[in-house]
C-alpha cells in the first residue's frame, strides 16, 4: 500500500537520508506538515493518469500555506 512507501519517500527528501532531530514543538509541527504535504503529493501521483486528485491538490495548498507560516 501507499503507506508502506511513505518512509522511503520521506527519507529521500533529506540530504543525509535521515530525518533531522526534533528539538522543539515547532520542529515537530513542521515535520508533520511536511509529511502531510508528501501524503497529498503521493495521492495525487497515484491518480495522475486519471487526471489527478482535486481534493489532494487543494489540501496541498492549505498544508503548504501552513508550512510557510511556520517557516522562519
Language-model features, listed with the residues they occupy:
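Intrinsically disordered, low-complexity regulatory regions
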Residues: 1-72
Amino acid at each position: 500500500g501507499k503507506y508502506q512507501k511513505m518512509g522511503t519517500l520521506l527519507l529521500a527528501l533529506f540530504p543525509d537520508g535521515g530525518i533531522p532531530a526534533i528539538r522543539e514543538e515547532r520542529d515537530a509541527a513542521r515535520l508533520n506538515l511536511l509529511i502531510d504535504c508528501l501524503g497529498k503529493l503521493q495521492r495525487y501521483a497515484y491518480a495522475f493518469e486519471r487526471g489527478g486528485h482535486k481534493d489532494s491538490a487543494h489540501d496541498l495548498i492549505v498544508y503548504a500555506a501552513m508550512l510557510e507560516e511556520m517557516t522562519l
